[in-house]
């Protein structure tokens, strides 16, 4: 049996995921440190287009290309070469067409969330809860009382193609109307045309 240990601050912020030997990561804000050596060593940190991380004694910059749900679809290295491509089933399972190399160490994938396979659990870290690839969270929604008509375990109200749940507390749509700018924007605040929004809002032909 394999055990994973997760440590959190009082406000629910994760600071350490590790195995029973203490091998894992230390989080200070969004910066991740490796605990695989005698003392914590810088591992990676996010920036606008991806992550910069340590590869041995060198630093490797990787650019993440995301889809409308924030899922990482392609990773490009600092030389502009595509190193890996991801395709997902609706609830985050890796599609067989993905060019996932065995040497690929990236753990930020579906919806941009950290995949915890290193700790022998096929779950995504959704901050407030851990999310499986079977359309369910592994624990009840702390805000379940706000949506009594929805199962407290279901992911994105059963609609993972259109909705996202970045915190594990409440699902939301990837597009919203900004009343100050008078346009629709994606989750990153970038303007999108109405046709893009309508594509995801239009009723199904079935």
Predicted regions and their residues:
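Conserved catalytic cores of ATP-dependent inositol ring kinases
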Residues: 1, 6, 10-24, 29-31, ...
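Beta-strand-dense domains in secreted/periplasmic systems and polymorphic toxin scaffolds
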Residues: 1, 17, 51-54, 75, ...
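Aromatic-rich beta-strand edge motifs centered on tyrosine
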Residues: 4-13, 24-33, 39-49, 62-70, ...
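A short local loop/turn or secondary-structure capping micro-motif enriched for an aromatic residue
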Residues: 23-25, 35-36, 49-53, 82-83, ...
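Short polybasic amphipathic segments
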Residues: 30-35, 49-54, 172-176
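A motif-centric feature for acidic-aromatic and gly/ser/thr-rich catalytic loops and repeats
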Residues: 35, 39, 53-127, 161-163
């Amino acid at each position: 049996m394999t055990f994973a240990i997760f440590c959190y601050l009082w406000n629910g912020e994760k600071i350490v995921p590790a195995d029973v030997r203490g091998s894992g990561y230390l989080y200070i804000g969004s910066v991740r440190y490796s605990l695989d050596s005698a003392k914590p060593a810088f591992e990676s940190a996010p920036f606008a287009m991806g992550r910069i991380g340590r590869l041995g004694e060198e630093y490797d910059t990787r650019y993440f290309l995301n889809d409308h749900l924030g899922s990482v679809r392609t990773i490009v290295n600092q030389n502009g070469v595509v190193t890996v491509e991801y395709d997902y089933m609706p609830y985050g399972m890796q599609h067989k067409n993905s060019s996932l190399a065995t040497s690929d160490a990236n753990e930020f994938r579906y919806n941009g969330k950290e995949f915890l396979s290193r700790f022998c659990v096929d779950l995504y870290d959704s901050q407030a809860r851990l999310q499986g690839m079977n359309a369910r969270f592994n624990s009840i929604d702390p805000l379940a009382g706000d949506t009594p008509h929805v199962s407290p375990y279901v992911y994105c109200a059963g609609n993972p193609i259109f909705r996202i749940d970045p915190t594990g507390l409440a699902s939301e749509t990837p597009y919203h109307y900004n009343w100050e700018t008078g346009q629709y924007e994606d989750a990153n605040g970038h303007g999108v045309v109405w046709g893009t929004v309508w594509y995801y809002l239009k009723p199904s032909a079935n």
